Amino acid sequence: MNGFKNVEKAAVLSLREQVAIQEGQVVSRTLAQNDAVSVTLFAFDKGEEISSHRSGGDAMVTCLEGVGRITVDDTVYTLHEGDSIVMPAGHPHAVFGEERFKMLPVVVF
């Protein structure tokens, strides 16, 4: 099983500072990826989105900065800094940057 990557170990860090918002883009930085879990930082410019898709695992998304809109099964949720939501495995979900927005989804397979 692989551990964390793309982040300094045994050091205090700010997760939201580990990924930068870029104009007109969704930027991602994978921190861990294996058969059991996926941990990836995302940064959305205002108005950018990840269209509806499904995941094979439950995903807990935590808003690190800004305001994001999460749609799960046609229900819209708004996340502010510090808020979290669990998107159930197999259910369609999408993410939209209501404002410039950073999130940390942790997917457990």
Question: Residue locations for each model-derived region?
Answer:
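Conserved short histidine dyad/triad with adjacent acidic residue
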Residues: G24-Q25, S38-S55
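A cytosolic small-molecule/anion-sensing beta-strand core signal
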Residues: L64-E65, H80-E81, E99
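Short acidic-glycine-tyrosine-enriched beta hairpin
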Residues: D74-A89
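Short, conserved beta-strand element in jelly-roll/cupin
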Residues: A43-D45, G56-I70
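A short, N-terminal "cap"/entry segment at the start of jelly-roll beta-barrel domains
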Residues: M1-A36, T71
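Ligand-binding loop in jelly-roll beta-barrel domains
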Residues: A89-F109
